[in-house]
């Protein structure tokens, strides 16, 4: 709702991607298993047993902790068109080849072929797209 008030003309809108939840200066790799001096991905579980992907950026010694579910707005075409963004972004960070192809195919179906898609077969979030920010 805030997006429609602010306007999205000339802006880019993320319609798919895992968002960073936190950037941490305390190295998860170093704290848990010792520093490997190599950038890569780790998995961290919270108290509810949700798995978070953590990218450790070894050269600068920080971590990016990603949300457990990606933001997916691909099926919100009408609302997106009303906002009139200049560009749409699909941000791939944690995906394997199969998921990347799946999301590109969904984008093509909805935005290029004008098709409707059914329910998505994986966990996702809308972020603040429907709720707004309070």
Q: What does each model-identified segment do?
A:
Residues 1-134:
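Active-site pocket-lining/capping segments in soluble small-molecule metabolic enzymes
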């Amino acid at each position: 709702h805030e997006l429609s008030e602010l306007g999205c003309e000339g802006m880019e809108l993320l319609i798919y991607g895992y968002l960073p939840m936190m950037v941490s200066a305390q190295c998860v790799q170093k704290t848990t298993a010792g520093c490997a001096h190599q950038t890569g991905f780790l998995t961290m579980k919270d108290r509810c047993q949700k798995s978070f992907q953590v990218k450790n950026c070894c050269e600068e010694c920080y971590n990016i902790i990603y949300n457990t579910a990606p933001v997916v707005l691909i099926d919100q075409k009408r609302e997106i068109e009303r906002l009139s963004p200049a560009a749409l972004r699909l941000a791939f960070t944690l995906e394997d080849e199969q998921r990347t192809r799946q999301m590109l195919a969904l984008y093509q179906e909805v935005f290029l072929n004008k098709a409707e898609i059914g329910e998505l077969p994986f966990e996702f979030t809308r972020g603040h797209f429907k709720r707004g920010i309070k």
